C-alpha cells in the first residue's frame, strides 16, 4: 500500500471551518488517504477523538498505518457513510463536534488501472469503491435495459448524447460483452460524433462519471449520510462537505439550506403556525474554492467546492 497517494483538497480551509478542539469528537466520513483526518487529530490534541469511515479496503489499510501514531484517539470503520448514524450509535456515540466529507474519488482509485475508474488506461470495467460487494460497471453496462442506461447517463452524467451512447452500448454488447474500460471508451467515441467532442473534455468523461455514481449509489449515500451526520452535530458543531460536481453540490446546498430554514408559513398569515425553527446556520453562503496555488499543485482541486454549516 506504500504507493497509495491522495492529496487532500482545501486542507487549511477545512481545518479553519471545523476549528477542532481537544476533547471534541469528530467524524471523517470519507477517510481516504487520511489527510484531513490527520490534520483534525493534530489540531485537536491531546484529547480530541476521530472516527473515520471508508468503504475502500485499501484506503482503510493505509489510514490505519498513517494514523497509528494517534493511538486510541482514532477509530476506523470499514463502512459506507450512508449508514453512519447507525454505525456511531452501535459504538455509543450520540453526538459529534464536527464532520468532514470529501466526496472526490481518490487519486489512488483513479490512478490504479485495475480499479476501472479511468478511461485513460485499459482495465476491467469495475468502478466499485468497495470491491467486496455490489455490482460492477460491467454488470450494469451488460445487463441494464437501454432505457435505464439512458436514464443513468443522462441524469448522473448530464450527457447530451446519452440516448445515442445507451443505444450504441446495447448494440455492442449484443455482439459480445463489454468487459474493459477501453472497450467502453471505443463504444462511446463511436456514439458521439467526433465534430461534437469538447476541446478540453474526453468524450467518455460524463458516461464514466454516471456509471461510477450508479455503481456506488453515491447520491443516495450522500443524502442519507448527510442527514445522519447533521442529526448528530452538537450545538456549535460544524459540518464541512467538499463536492466535485453539480449533482453532489446541489444535494449539499439544498440539504444545508433546508436545515437552516425557519418558518415556511405563507407571508399573508399574521403568525407562524408551522412551528418550524432553523436548527443550523450557513457558515458559507457561497462555496469556498481552491486558490491558484493549490490548483497548480493539485489540478483535481479545480472543481472542488466546500460548504460549511453550524448547529445552533
UniProtKB/Swiss-Prot annotation:
Keywords, comma-separated and alphabetical: Cytoplasm, Methyltransferase, rRNA processing, S-adenosyl-L-methionine, Transferase
One of the record's GO molecular function terms: rRNA (cytosine-N4-)-methyltransferase activity
Reaction catalysis annotation: cytidine(1402) in 16S rRNA + S-adenosyl-L-methionine = N(4)-methylcytidine(1402) in 16S rRNA + S-adenosyl-L-homocysteine + H(+)
Domain of life: Bacteria
GO biological process: rRNA base methylation
EC code: 2.1.1.199
Keyword Zinc-finger: no
Compartments in which it is found: Cytoplasm
Alphabetical list of SUPFAM superfamilies matching this protein: Putative methyltransferase TM0872, insert domain, S-adenosyl-L-methionine-dependent methyltransferases
Binding residues annotated for S-adenosyl-L-methionine, in chain numbering: 34-36, 54, 81, 102, 109
A Pfam cross-reference name: Methyltransf_5
GO cellular component: cytoplasm
Family: Belongs to the methyltransferase superfamily. RsmH family.
Functional summary from the UniProt entry: Specifically methylates the N4 position of cytidine in position 1402 (C1402) of 16S rRNA.
Protein name: Ribosomal RNA small subunit methyltransferase H
Amino acid at each position: 500500500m506504500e504507493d497509495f497517494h491522495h492529496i487532500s483538497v482545501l486542507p487549511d480551509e477545512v481545518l479553519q471551518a471545523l476549528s477542532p478542539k481537544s476533547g471534541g469528537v469528530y467524524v471523517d466520513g470519507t477517510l481516504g488517504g487520511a489527510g484531513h483526518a490527520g490534520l483534525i487529530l493534530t489540531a485537536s490534541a491531546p484529547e480530541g477523538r476521530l472516527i473515520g469511515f471508508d468503504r475502500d479496503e485499501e484506503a482503510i489499510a493505509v489510514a490505519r498505518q498513517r494514523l497509528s501514531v494517534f493511538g486510541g484517539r482514532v477509530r476506523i470503520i470499514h463502512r459506507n457513510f450512508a449508514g453512519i448514524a447507525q454505525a456511531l450509535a452501535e459504538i455509543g456515540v450520540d453526538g459529534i463536534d464536527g464532520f468532514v466529507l470529501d466526496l472526490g474519488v481518490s487519486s489512488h482509485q483513479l490512478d490504479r488501472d485495475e480499479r476501472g475508474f479511468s478511461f485513460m488506461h485499459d482495465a476491467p470495467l469495475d468502478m466499485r469503491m468497495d470491491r467486496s460487494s455490489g455490482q460492477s460497471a460491467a454488470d450494469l453496462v451488460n445487463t441494464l435495459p437501454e432505457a435505464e442506461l439512458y436514464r443513468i447517463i443522462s441524469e448522473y452524467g448530464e450527457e447530451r448524447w446519452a440516448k445515442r451512447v445507451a443505444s450504441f452500448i446495447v448494440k455492442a454488447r449484443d455482439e459480445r460483452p463489454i468487459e474493459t474500460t477501453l472497450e467502453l471508451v471505443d463504444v462511446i467515441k463511436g456514439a458521439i460524433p467526433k465534430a461534437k467532442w469538447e476541446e478540453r473534455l474526453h468524450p467518455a468523461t460524463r458516461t464514466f462519471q454516471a456509471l461510477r455514481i450508479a455503481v456506488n449509489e453515491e447520491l443516495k449515500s450522500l443524502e442519507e449520510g448527510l442527514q445522519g451526520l447533521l442529526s448528530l452535530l452538537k450545538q456549535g458543531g460544524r459540518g464541512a462537505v467538499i463536492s466535485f460536481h453539480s449533482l453532489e453540490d446541489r444535494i449539499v446546498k439544498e440539504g444545508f439550506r433546508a436545515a437552516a430554514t425557519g418558518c415556511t408559513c405563507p407571508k399573508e398569515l399574521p403568525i407562524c403556525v408551522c412551528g418550524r425553527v432553523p436548527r443550523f446556520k450557513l457558515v458559507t453562503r457561497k462555496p469556498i474554492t481552491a486558490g491558484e496555488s493549490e490548483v497548480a499543485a493539485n489540478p483535481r482541486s479545480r472543481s472542488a467546492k466546500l460548504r460549511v454549516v453550524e448547529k445552533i
